[in-house]
Regions:
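Contiguous mid-protein beta-loop-alpha structural module that forms a pocket-lining wall or clamp
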Residues: 157
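A structural motif corresponding to the C-terminal end of an alpha-helix
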Residues: 97-105, 139, 183-198
Length: 207
């Protein structure tokens, strides 16, 4: 299929790719078969605590790209509310592993409008991203850095889904979502410094 389409990337796009017990074996198989063809292996939306440095290193050997992690909430309080099961320490440890593996571009996925979300929770998103950016310079020696660190913050808007703990939660109006995205964007600008590069991308609430 790759030969016929000309595609240059194979993406394991499941939301729980890192929970797959045979992930390392699958990555090894893909690398063995496509490394010489210059085909990139993409592992999006990974759980930081379940990500293997060994797997990262093998993927990095093919082609440098960005990694996507999904903390989903910026504050520990809100991560506990949604039962994410991630502490800031684990997030920073996972990001440090990625930087040690040769990455300098990381995409962080969050949700806005989660039940009980406050302005402090929103501001915690760019603050966490900035801590991760600072970690890059603390973790990787200057002579080993692969360019400037780039952290991309991506948010989507919470939509209640049936048969989930928050199925009866209220969905916000589009104007409320835009107001929350503005809070995040404004606070991102306050985090910028000469070393790190924080980018923020937010979809339209009508997407």
């Amino acid at each position: 299929m790759l030969k016929n389409t000309g595609h240059e990337e194979i993406s394991l796009s499941s939301l729980s790719s890192s929970d797959y017990s045979q992930l390392e074996e699958l990555v090894n198989f893909l690398i063995d078969n496509f490394k010489d063809k210059g085909v990139n292996i993409s592992l999006p939306s990974l759980r930081i605590d379940a990500f293997s440095l060994d797997v990262m290193g093998k993927v990095q050997d093919i082609k440098k790209s960005s990694l996507t992690f999904a903390p989903e909430a910026g504050s520990q309080r809100l991560r506990d509310v949604i039962n994410k099961g991630l502490t800031k320490e684990v997030i920073l440890e996972g990001a440090g592993m990625a930087f040690e593996g040769g990455w300098n571009k990381v995409k962080l996925y969050f949700m806005l409008g989660l039940p009980t979300e406050t302005e402090e929770d929103m501001k915690a998103i760019p603050e966490l991203a900035n801590e991760i950016a600072a970690l890059y310079y603390d973790t990787v020696p200057k002579e080993q850095r692969n360019g400037k660190c780039q952290i991309t913050i991506s948010t989507s808007f919470f939509v209640p889904k049936p048969f989930t703990p928050f199925q009866w939660a209220t969905m916000l109006d589009p104007s409320d979502y835009l107001a929350r995205a503005k809070i995040v964007n404004d606070h991102v600008k306050e985090q910028l410094n000469h070393k790190s590069c924080l980018l923020y991308t937010s979809p339209s609430p009508r997407d």
